[in-house]
Amino acid sequence: MKIGIVGAMAQEVEILKNLMADRTETRVASAVIFEGKINGKDVVLLQSGIGKVAAAIGTTALLQLAKPDLVINTGSAGGVAKGLKVGDIVISDETRYHDADVTAFGYEKGQLPANPAAFLSDKKLADLAQEIAEKQGQSVKRGLICSGDSFINSEDKITQIKADFPNVTGVEMEATAIAQVCYAFNVPFVVVRAISDGGDGKASISFEEFLPLAAKQSSALVLEMIDRL
């Protein structure tokens, strides 16, 4: 089995990259694909760049060139569900775009033509992630993760997203694009991210301060997932 892992930023993939043995590096457009072994397992690690387009370009290259059997999206997210705090884990049951709107033609908010309204995560992967997170003593929230090309940093933005998607747990900028590509290629995926901020007016300061913690927490979970897969 070959395990695919996707993170947007260098800080989000650095821990796993540094654990890779026999590491090779391939650049495709703005994406960097690292391939090697982690604890004896075949792993391909994508540093995609930030945003939906970068994530889609990188994930497409990853699936076509490296052909992983599954994809885990790791990194950080803004926590918008009640009770979430910095360092907590969010795991996707589904992902949706919060900034797509073709409702004028009868589609659901967030749905793009020729695509489902929500991209469903692989249940076995989500179950495994939750089991490991709870075993590690992490606080976990599982459910809907919403993506858009905006860093959410105000209560007004959170209120709008929650009005459209009341069950949203976390917000970020790549997961749904990654999920859409995996859906198109029929590759199972799950999103496993750690909370770096609350999406409010202090989000940018919190993100800068707590990104290393979020990267450490999510990487620890993904590392054990690799061992168990």
Curated annotation (Swiss-Prot):
Positions annotated to bind substrate: 78, 152, 173-174
Catalytic residues identified in the record: 12, 197
SUPFAM superfamilies on file: Purine and uridine phosphorylases (SSF53167)
Transmembrane segments: none
Reactions catalysed: S-adenosyl-L-homocysteine + H2O = S-(5-deoxy-D-ribos-5-yl)-L-homocysteine + adenine; S-methyl-5'-thioadenosine + H2O = 5-(methylsulfanyl)-D-ribose + adenine; 5'-deoxyadenosine + H2O = 5-deoxy-D-ribose + adenine
EC numbers on record: 3.2.2.9
Gene Ontology, cellular component aspect: cytosol
Origin superkingdom: Bacteria
Pathway(s) this gene product operates in, as recorded in its UniProt entry: Amino-acid biosynthesis; L-methionine biosynthesis via salvage pathway; S-methyl-5-thio-alpha-D-ribose 1-phosphate from S-methyl-5'-thioadenosine (hydrolase route): step 1/2
Keywords, ordered alphabetically: Amino-acid biosynthesis, Hydrolase, Methionine biosynthesis
A GO term, aspect molecular function: methylthioadenosine nucleosidase activity
Broad class of enzyme this protein falls into: hydrolase
GO BP terms, alphabetized: L-methionine salvage from methylthioadenosine; L-methionine salvage from S-adenosylmethionine; nucleoside catabolic process
Protein family: Belongs to the PNP/UDP phosphorylase family. MtnN subfamily.
Role according to the record: Catalyzes the irreversible cleavage of the glycosidic bond in both 5'-methylthioadenosine (MTA) and S-adenosylhomocysteine (SAH/AdoHcy) to adenine and the corresponding thioribose, 5'-methylthioribose and S-ribosylhomocysteine, respectively. Also cleaves 5'-deoxyadenosine, a toxic by-product of radical S-adenosylmethionine (SAM) enzymes, into 5-deoxyribose and adenine.
Protein name (Swiss-Prot/TrEMBL): 5'-methylthioadenosine/S-adenosylhomocysteine nucleosidase
Origin species: Haemophilus influenzae (strain PittEE)
Gene: mtnN
